[in-house]
Amino acid sequence: NCIGEQVPCDENDPRCCSGLVVLKKTLHGIWIKSSYCYKCK
């Protein structure tokens, strides 16, 4: 079971699906506490 794109995940144990990378999400320059899985660009 892997975590899909733009889904919150644990940065220490992300389990993102293949081809995805863990990124910290920003909102108007403010770091949101959770990490998300995103596609590599």
Swiss-Prot record:
Task of the protein: Intracerebroventricular injection paralyzes mice. Has no effect on voltage-gated sodium currents.
Cysteine pairings via disulfide bonds: 2-16, 9-37, 17-40
Gene Ontology cellular-component terms listed: extracellular region
Lineage, highest ranks first: Eukaryota, Metazoa, Ecdysozoa, Arthropoda, Chelicerata
Entry GO MF terms: sodium channel inhibitor activity; toxin activity
Protein name: U3-theraphotoxin-Hs1a
Segments crossing the lipid bilayer: none
Record's keyword annotation contains Disulfide bond: yes
Family: Belongs to the neurotoxin 14 (magi-1) family. 01 (HNTX-16) subfamily.
Record organism: Cyriopagopus schmidti
Tissue occurrence: Expressed by the venom gland.
Keywords assigned: Disulfide bond, Secreted, Toxin
Superkingdom of the source species: Eukaryota
Intracellular or extracellular location(s): Secreted
